[in-house]
Amino acid sequence: TLVSGDNNQALAIGGITNGVTNLELTNAYATIANHGEYHTPIFYTQVIDHNGNVILDNTETMETGREVLKDTTAWLLTNAMQDVLTSPEGTGGSANPGNTPVAAKTGTTNDDRDTLMVGYSPYYTVGFWGGNDDNAIIRSTSFSNRVWKQVMYRLHEGLERKNFTKPEGIVQAVVCKKSGKLAIPDVCNAD
């Protein structure tokens, strides 16, 4: 439940008074990755032994999703979060696995007690939280980016490179940096 003090930037990474679990936060990002379609989260789909035999099968519990975001809204969020990993100004450049398109959000609490990296590709959504059980200050906050990068890299080894799909209804245009209006060639370029 949100309270009035929860209206801040930390909301995007679960920084609310009563908190969210890593599973809930990761599932929120999975909903964006699924074009705005929400599915109740499950921890695993199958457990397979070293011989390739399915020991546990959780695929029957997977439900049909329901739309909670427009696909266009989900794509705009994805497009913005791709900059976190690809833009020189982005805070997650060191987390880009390089072998798949990704969108993500980094996060660190003001007092360096928690670090977070949550994001997705067209295939997988991964959330990573790092901190101490006793809420002590952590020595480094960049390790969440490194762990997330390695997990995403390994998950995508051998997979066909797939881009995020832009839905119908998205209109792209060049905007003049000075006026904020549509750019006019030779009058106001997008610089």
What annotation goes with each model-predicted range?
Residues T1-T26:
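Mid-domain, small-residue-enriched loop/turn segments at the edges of structured enzyme/sensor domains
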Residues N18-D191:
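A penicillin-recognizing enzyme superfamily signal
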